[in-house]
UniProtKB/Swiss-Prot annotation:
Residues 1-15 have a biased composition (Basic and acidic residues). A zinc finger (CCHC-type) spans 580-597. Residues 212-396 form the Helicase ATP-binding domain. Residues 407-567 form the Helicase C-terminal domain. It comes from Mus musculus (Mouse). The gene is Ddx41. GO terms for molecular function: ATP binding; ATP hydrolysis activity; DNA binding; RNA binding; RNA helicase activity; zinc ion binding. Multifunctional protein that participates in many aspects of cellular RNA metabolism. Plays pivotal roles in innate immune sensing and hematopoietic homeostasis. Recognizes foreign or self-nucleic acids generated during microbial infection, thereby initiating anti-pathogen responses. Mechanistically, phosphorylation by BTK allows binding to dsDNA leading to interaction with STING1. Modulates the homeostasis of dsDNA through its ATP-dependent DNA-unwinding activity and ATP-independent strand-annealing activity. One of its GO terms (biological process) is cell population proliferation. Pfam families: DEAD (PF00270), Helicase_C (PF00271). This is Probable ATP-dependent RNA helicase DDX41. The keyword Hydrolase applies. Disruption phenotype: Ddx41 knockout mice fail to survive postnatally. No knockout mice survive past postnatal day 17. By postnatal day 5, the major organs of KO mice, in particular, the spleen, are greatly reduced in size, and there are fewer erythroblasts and erythrocytes in the liver, spleen, and bone marrow (BM). Peripheral blood smears indicated anemia and complete blood cell count (CBC) analysis show decreased leukocytes, erythrocytes, and platelets in postnatal day 3 KO mice. A motif (DEAD box) lies at residues 344-347.
Length: 622
């Protein structure tokens, strides 16, 4: 018994030691233990890691594209004092980094704008369907018999550049003809020189100094100059000379012609241009030159009268797109021998929906023609598109395209909607008559006209809703001084010339800044000074007011307090890529990315989806 007791104690001791060693092993196992993670959870974790890696890679690529180094730990400089780096150096380093980021933002903006311009650019060239279908292209401009005087040709290119710099003439193109500073040196006949003198035109304006020699040389041209700078003479005098040359070589027979064609966007402008051509043709005839016939083809007039001139053979024709297309389709007019085409206020015609009509008119030409485009406002988008119709064109720009005339004093006043009519009478007292009043809506024109008549003011009104006879009588009465005030919509703002006007009143702000430039350009013409008063209020679109503010600053005019408070964010972003403002509409207060005109056009296009009639023009519906 005594022997078994120690054995039992030993066994307990062994169990105790064994238990102790087991607990130590268990502790070690606890330390090495990895908890079990379900398969789904493991997959989610792996996916998260992959996404993080991909994001990191993408941000590095973006930073490389923008030209900045990938941000690492060394970029995260703690703000505050650092060892071996002065606060000035630290400030300079941070400033450089901020400028680098700003530059990348500008580059990004430019890329975005290029994409937008490409998307809105017209895919088809401004050519006839026949020319595009047959792949007809012309490499060389039309040859003419005119050459500059020998001594002008012998002058150096440096001298020509000095003349252009003196008159602020910007030219683009190859083989540009030299600028000529007098009408006599341009080889015009004595009768035309006398006619110019009678009108008080003694020296050519900057656009005429470079433009007339360019056209007489037979070159295609885009002419951009501020309102009242004499653009009409640039394309009317050369066409008279070309037609006179053709008539002397071989007289025009019955139903032949025209040789020269001028297209205008409005009837009033066409009538005015026709009057200028008639004046110089009459002077040439009095000076024993052959009779040159000029036809006026506009809507609202009897076709019979127009055909009477055409039947005898016509040298020149001034027309509006609608009536000209009608006569061409009815085969009453032929453009077989036409070699000279001028589009006055070209950007408005292309922009205002006449583009299809212009293409159709182009398809009636049988050979190469000399094409000229003129306007006071021509955004980059229109210039690029128009160049597709020209052969080695010369672009002549006097001042910025769309800039206001510096001879006009611009006054902008905040007037409540209900107070406009009463304040209008006060504004009429600023200058002696004649005065021109513009309004956007036809109803406003009629209301202003009626109010002025009730107050005893001698006023006339024109807008698209009135018939042609009434419009013509109103303009003639105003031009002759029988009436003191002309109230009109924008139909009278394009190209019309009323020499004595000292004051233009904008009853409302137009929806596009281009129309504002054309409106105020009716005064301050031919070197005279004029005043333009514009009423603005809360109803005006802010983007147009921003453009107006920029236009006033550019012309060094007084900016009213109501416009001074307007800000468009980062002003430096308005002037990037070597061009200020919007490339689509020409406004200075915004870029193409924020253009309200482009936005309105895109909205209209979207709303027209599904409504378009896909039947061809004049086709039968079977």
């Amino acid at each position: 018994m005594e022997d078994s007791e120690p054995e039992r104690k030993r066994a307990r001791a062994d169990e105790a030691t064994a238990g102790g060693s087991r607990s130590e092993d268990e502790d070690e196992d606890d330390e090495d233990y990895v908890p079990y993670v379900p398969l789904r959870q493991r997959r989610q974790l792996l996916l998260q890691k992959l996404l993080q890696r991909r994001r990191k890679g993408a941000t590095e690529e973006e930073q490389q594209d923008s030209g900045s180094e990938p941000r690492g730990d060394e970029d995260d400089i703690p703000l505050g004092p650092q060892s071996n780096v002065s606060l000035l150096d630290q400030h300079q380093h941070l400033k450089e980094k901020a400028e680098a980021r700003k530059e990348s933002a500008k580059e990004k903006q430019l890329k975005e704008e290029e994409k937008i311009l490409e998307s809105v650019a017209e895919g088809r060239a401004l050519m006839s369907v026949k020319e595009m279908a047959k792949g007809i292209t012309y490499d060389d401009p039309i040859k003419t018999s005119w050459t500059p005087p020998r001594y002008v040709l012998s002058m150096s290119e440096e001298r020509h550049e000095r003349v252009r710099k003196k008159y602020h003439i910007l030219v683009e193109g190859d083989g540009i003809p030299p600028p000529i500073k007098s009408f006599k040196e341009m080889k015009f006949p004595a009768a035309i020189l006398r006619g110019l003198k009678k009108k008080g035109i003694l020296h050519p304006t900057p656009i005429q100094i470079q433009g007339i020699p360019t056209i007489l040389s037979g070159r295609d041209m885009i002419g951009i100059a501020f309102t009242g700078s004499g653009k009409t003479l640039v394309f009317t005098l050369p066409v008279i000379m070309f037609c006179l040359e053709q008539e002397k070589r071989l007289p025009f027979s019955k139903r032949e012609g025209p040789y020269g064609l001028i297209i205008c966007p409005s009837r009033e402008l066409a009538r005015q241009t026709h009057g200028i051509l008639e004046y110089y043709c009459r002077l040439l005839q009095e000076d024993s030159s052959p009779l040159l016939r000029c036809a006026l083809c506009i809507g609202g007039m009897s076709v019979k009268e127009q055909m009477e001139t055409i039947r005898h053979g016509v040298h020149m024709m001034v027309a509006t797109p609608g009536r000209l297309m009608d006569l061409l389709q009815k085969k009453m007019v032929s453009l077989d021998i036409c070699r000279y085409l001028a589009l006055d206020e070209a950007d408005r015609m292309i922009d205002m929906g006449f583009e299809g009509d212009i293409r159709t008119i182009f398809s009636y030409f049988k050979g190469q023609r000399q094409t000229l485009l003129f306007s006071a406002t021509m955004p980059k988008k229109i210039q690029n598109f128009a160049k597709s119709a020209l052969v080695k064109p010369v672009t002549i720009n006097v001042g910025r395209a769309g800039a206001a005339s510096l001879d006009v004093i611009q006054e902008v006043e905040y007037v409540k909607e209900e107070a406009k009519m009463v304040y209008l009478l006060e504004c009429l007292q600023k200058t002696p008559p004649p005065v021109l009043i513009f309004a956007e809506k036809k109803a406003d024109v009629d209301a202003i006209h009626e109010y002025l008549l009730l107050k005893g003011v001698e006023a006339v009104a024109i807008h698209g809703g009135k018939d042609q006879e009434e419009r013509t009588k109103a303009i003639e009465a105003f031009r002759e001084g029988k009436k003191d005030v002309l109230v009109a919509t924008d139909v009278a703002s394009k190209g019309l010339d009323f020499p004595a006007i000292q004051h233009v009143i904008n009853y409302d702000m137009p929806e596009e800044i281009e129309n504002y430039v054309h409106r105020i350009g009716r005064t301050g013409r031919s070197g005279n000074t004029g005043i333009a008063t514009t009423f603005i209020n809360k109803a005006c679109d802010e983007s147009v007011l921003m453009d107006l503010k920029a236009l006033l600053l550019e012309a060094k005019q007084k900016v009213p307090p109501v416009l001074q408070v307007l800000h468009c964010g980062d002003e430096s972003m308005l002037d990037i890529g070597g061009e200020r403002g919007c490339a689509f509409c020409g406004g200075l207060g915004h870029r193409i990315t924020d253009c309200p005109k482009l936005e309105a056009m895109q909205t209209k296009q979207v709303s027209n989806i599904g409504r378009k009639d896909y039947l061809a023009h004049s086709s039968m519906d079977f």
